[in-house]
Curated annotation (Swiss-Prot):
It catalyses: (R)-pantoate + NAD(+) = 2-dehydropantoate + NADH + H(+); (R)-pantoate + NADP(+) = 2-dehydropantoate + NADPH + H(+). PANTHER family: 2-DEHYDROPANTOATE 2-REDUCTASE, 2-DEHYDROPANTOATE 2-REDUCTASE-RELATED. This is 2-dehydropantoate 2-reductase. Pfam families: ApbA (PF02558), ApbA_C (PF08546). It comes from Archaeoglobus fulgidus (strain ATCC 49558 / DSM 4304 / JCM 9628 / NBRC 100126 / VC-16). It is an enzyme of class 1 (oxidoreductase).
Length: 294
């Protein structure tokens, strides 16, 4: 199948970057956005940072038919957008979201769903202006571990766009591994209002992060996955030392976070296995407390 139309469902920071790179590679891209971002995109999309470009883009508030649809909305909006995608032929739907459970929600409404994980860095400097902040890797795959033509097709489009992308047979492991790392970094940085590097530099914060990671490791072990969570948390925090986590940015902007789909998912899975994820639950409740005061 020849891919021509690619849709970005949720053209925020990451969605705008991915969409821009794909459009620059010659594909027709539909940017689905809302509010001030939609109004700004009607005037054009600016990319700065590792790549500089000014693009005229096709943007809309509702999804349309496409060959591939990348879902890049916040996890708490997944169900809402999944219902909208069910009303069109969205093609192969690939989540590039944070947290656990997005793919299962999408699969209730969409014909073909792939899981995805990306470490590319994007920040919205202003509405209609995305900063390409960091190169990374993007992995896509079937949730049941099969290697499929659809996953390879999606990876090929991303590679055409100049991204490092690979179709893999262990996407569920990668989604959980990213969630465990996020669980140890994001809430701590959000509550303490610090950059990622402080999680390893400050011994008090590192003690909490290591405990969160160990609970995640135990849960993943019961799922059949071996993951050295604490080492990975340290590595990611050091590599992104100057970054402000998305959860910190959300709280600073008075917005809801994705904590329910990160620490909340670990707590929930732990309960299934009889593992008490007390530190994850504490961070979950602290972030909930901050959110409720917004």
């Amino acid at each position: 199948m020849r891919v021509q139309r690619v849709q970005i469902m949720g053209a925020g920071a990451l969605g705008s970057l991915v969409g821009a790179l794909i459009q620059l590679a010659g594909y027709d891209v539909i940017f689905v956005a809302r509010g001030k971002q939609l109004e700004a995109l009607k005037k054009g999309l600016r990319v700065s940072g590792l790549k500089n470009a000014e693009l005229k883009v096709y943007c809309t508030s509702q999804p349309e038919d496409a060959d591939i649809t990348f879902v890049t909305v916040k996890a708490y909006d997944t169900e809402t957008v999944a219902k909208k995608l069910a009303e069109v032929d969205a093609g192969v739907v690939c989540s590039l979201q944070n947290g656990v459970g997005n793919e299962e929600i999408l699969a209730k409404y969409c014909r073909k769903v792939l899981g995805g994980v990306t470490t590319y860095g994007a920040n919205l400097k202003d509405y209609g202006h995305v900063v390409y902040a960091g190169e990374g890797y993007t992995y896509v795959g079937e949730m049941d571990g099969r290697v499929s033509g659809e996953a390879e097709m999606v990876a090929e489009v991303l590679r055409d766009a100049g991204m490092r992308a690979e179709a893999v047979n262990d996407i569920e492991f990668r989604i959980w591994a990213k969630a465990v790392v996020n669980a140890a970094i994001n809430p701590i940085t959000a509550i303490c209002r610090v950059k990622n590097g402080e999680v390893v530099r400050n011994p008090h914060l590192w003690e909490v992060a290591r405990a969160v990671a160990d609970e995640g490791r135990q849960v993943m072990a019961r799922m059949g996955y071996e993951f050295d969570a604490a080492s990975e948390v340290r590595k990611v925090a050091e590599m992104t030392a100057e970054n402000r986590s998305s959860m910190l940015q959300d709280l600073e902007r008075g917005k809801r976070t994705e904590v329910e789909f990160i620490n909340g998912a670990i707590v929930k899975k732990g309960e299934e296995f009889g593992i008490d994820c007390a530190v994850n639950r504490t961070l979950l409740n602290l972030v909930r407390g901050v959110e409720s005061g917004l």
